């Protein structure tokens, strides 16, 4: 299960905004760039002011806005005939860069070497997970399998950000360990599911080619 499956309903709410932007000279790449700059700015704020509360409270808002912008740029590209190869890859690269910019500063909040190491590996696995998902393009479909896709990461990092502010237990080693371990395990499950999905798509495409050549 992944929050990604709620995307069609989310897009339905945002479609009027997407249509308005498309008819007023805004391009999908502009929207993608806005989301990227916003994410980097928030990441810098968390890193620069680790003892301040406002960057942590702002993160869920920024992540929600980023998800909205990500949905809007895709709708604009598809529904208003603005799709380009450059735009597709800009979107993929900016998603990875945005995730790392937003989440890497949280290394300072995890207590103890092991939780920090687990969270660091989680960050590395984000890249692997998305790379496997992107590989799916070669076989006809981009893989968005969960349970730790982009939207899921946004949800659970928002929860962690708020827990730092609201829960004293977030400052303990056991909380840091359990949370970082859960993220790490979930992203590996995601990697496995996406890999299996890519293999299934590859075999399906191969079988289709064999049927055509028979």
Segments from the language model and where they lie:
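Glycine-rich active-site/cofactor-binding loop and its immediate structural neighborhood
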Residues: 52-88
């Amino acid at each position: 299960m992944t929050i990604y499956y709620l995307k069609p309903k989310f897009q339905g709410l945002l479609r009027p905004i997407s249509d308005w932007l498309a008819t007023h000279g805004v391009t999908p790449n502009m929207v993608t760039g806005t989301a990227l700059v916003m994410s980097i700015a928030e990441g810098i704020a968390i890193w620069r002011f680790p003892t301040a509360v406002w960057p942590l409270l702002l993160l869920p808002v920024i992540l929600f806005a980023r998800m909205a912008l990500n949905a809007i740029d895709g709708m604009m590209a598809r529904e208003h005939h603005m799709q380009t190869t450059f735009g597709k890859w800009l979107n993929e690269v900016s998603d990875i860069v945005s995730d790392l910019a937003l989440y890497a500063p949280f290394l300072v909040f995890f207590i103890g070497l092991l939780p920090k190491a687990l969270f660091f590996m989680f960050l590395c696995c984000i890249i692997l997970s998305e790379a496997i998902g992107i590989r799916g393009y070669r076989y006809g479909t981009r893989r968005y399998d969960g349970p730790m896709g982009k939207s899921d990461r946004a949800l659970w990092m928002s929860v962690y950000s708020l827990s730092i502010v609201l829960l004293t237990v977030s400052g303990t080693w056991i909380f840091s360990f359990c949370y970082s371990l859960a993220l790490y395990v979930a992203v590996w499950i995601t990697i496995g599911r996406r890999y299996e999905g890519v293999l299934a798509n590859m075999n399906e495409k191969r079988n289709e080619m064999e049927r055509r050549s028979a």
